[in-house]
């Protein structure tokens, strides 16, 4: 009957044994590694740069500012209107200084101009992307990434031929427009080589 007692004592001692962090106080906490902090900072900076250069992201960031500016503009306009009405009626207006309506209106127009530029830039990028996909739909392999060559990629000599054909077409269009303008104005000038000069 004495045998179960050492086993029970062993079980109780085993259950009471704790790790080095629990018996001797709190264990060492994991500190963030410097590489993780640097990586997160670099990713945040890269994301901020992408937002600055991307017109769509810039547009999304400016929309809340435009709403807030419009609300401020309406509020300032109402306050100025109430004050002017009180002055016209001979009533005493509040002595609190009011915001200038022209400054708020100028800020609102500045945000509108920025939004217009973002939309124009986004439209221009979309047009260039569509033109690139239309006139040069295949990819061109680069010498720095030979492994990234795709089966439908365009060889570089053939790509140069396509570019030269596009330049020739642009020159022909420029010459035709110049001749048309000269005929309309009645002027005769020497034939121009067009944009870019000779190849």
Curated annotation (Swiss-Prot):
Residues modified to N-acetylalanine: 2
Record bears the keyword Acetylation: yes
Recorded GO CC terms: core mediator complex; mediator complex; nucleoplasm; nucleus
Chief site of localization: nucleus
Keywords assigned: Acetylation, Activator, Nucleus, Transcription, Transcription regulation
Superkingdom to which the source organism belongs: Eukaryota
Biased composition (Gly residues): 18-27
Cell compartments where the protein resides: Nucleus
Ranges where the record places region Disordered: 1-47
Gene Ontology annotations of biological process type: positive regulation of transcription elongation by RNA polymerase II; positive regulation of transcription initiation by RNA polymerase II; RNA polymerase II preinitiation complex assembly
Biased composition (Low complexity): 1-17, 28-47
Quaternary structure (record): Component of the Mediator complex, which is composed of MED1, MED4, MED6, MED7, MED8, MED9, MED10, MED11, MED12, MED13, MED13L, MED14, MED15, MED16, MED17, MED18, MED19, MED20, MED21, MED22, MED23, MED24, MED25, MED26, MED27, MED29, MED30, MED31, CCNC, CDK8 and CDC2L6/CDK11. The MED12, MED13, CCNC and CDK8 subunits form a distinct module termed the CDK8 module. Mediator containing the CDK8 module is less active than Mediator lacking this module in supporting transcriptional activation.
Family: Belongs to the Mediator complex subunit 29 family.
PANTHER family assigned: MEDIATOR OF RNA POLYMERASE II TRANSCRIPTION SUBUNIT 29
Biological role stated in the UniProt entry: Component of the Mediator complex, a coactivator involved in the regulated transcription of nearly all RNA polymerase II-dependent genes. Mediator functions as a bridge to convey information from gene-specific regulatory proteins to the basal RNA polymerase II transcription machinery. Mediator is recruited to promoters by direct interactions with regulatory proteins and serves as a scaffold for the assembly of a functional preinitiation complex with RNA polymerase II and the general transcription factors.
Descriptive protein name: Mediator of RNA polymerase II transcription subunit 29
């Amino acid at each position: 009957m004495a045998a179960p007692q050492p086993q029970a004592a062993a079980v109780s001692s085993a259950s009471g044994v704790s790790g080095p962090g629990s018996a001797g106080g709190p264990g060492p906490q994991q500190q963030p590694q410097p590489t993780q902090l640097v990586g997160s900072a670099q990713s945040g900076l890269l994301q901020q740069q992408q937002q600055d250069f991307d017109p769509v992201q810039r547009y999304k960031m400016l929309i809340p500012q435009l709403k807030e500016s419009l609300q401020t503009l309406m509020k300032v306009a109402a306050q100025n209107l109430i004050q002017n009405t009180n002055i016209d009626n001979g009533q005493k207006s509040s002595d609190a200084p009011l915001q200038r309506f022209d400054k708020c209106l100028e800020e609102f127009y500045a945000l509108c101009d920025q939004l217009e530029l973002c939309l124009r830039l986004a439209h221009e990028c979309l047009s260039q992307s569509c033109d690139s996909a239309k006139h040069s739909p295949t990819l061109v392999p680069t010498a720095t990434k030979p492994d990234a060559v795709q089966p439908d990629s365009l060889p570089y000599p053939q790509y140069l031929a396509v570019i030269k054909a596009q330049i020739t077409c642009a020159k022909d269009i420029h010459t035709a427009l110049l001749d048309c303008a000269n005929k309309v104005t009645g002027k005769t000038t020497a034939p121009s080589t067009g944009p870019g000069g000779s190849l």
